[in-house]
Amino acid sequence: MGKPAPVCGSCVCGDVAVEIDFPAFWAWHDHSAATRLAHGAAYATYVGCWRSRVRITQGEAGLTRFVADGTARSFCARCGTPILYERDHSPRMVNLPRALFSSRTGREPRYHVGIEQAPDWAYGGDRLAPLKGFPGVLWARPRRRKRADSAAP
């Protein structure tokens, strides 16, 4: 049996393409404020890989970087898709948004990082009901008010 095929991913516009060796080293959900702002979402799911197992296969010149507080985030300069998340304290590791990859990366998220920074509006797993007339859209159905009992004294 040979070496598993690499896992390929890309940004929204397709200008930047990456590949990682299968399997990724780890995966987690990041709820930190910095990640929330970088992704424009309540949290992001990342896969972490050894730097030697990550390759930019297309569009490296099309990456732009933002560096602050010991972290570097690389984005596609054309469409803004987050591509790489690197930290000074772990220079041999590179983290990539899980959403870049349409196929399996070999790791399922096992950790929640920065959960104490999760916003109060983030979805917490409450059961949602289908929204009538909009297939695939779920909503939190308002609770019915109890009617006043007319027979009560």
Task: Provide a role label for each language-model segment.
Residues M1-P153:
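A short Gly-Trp-Pro
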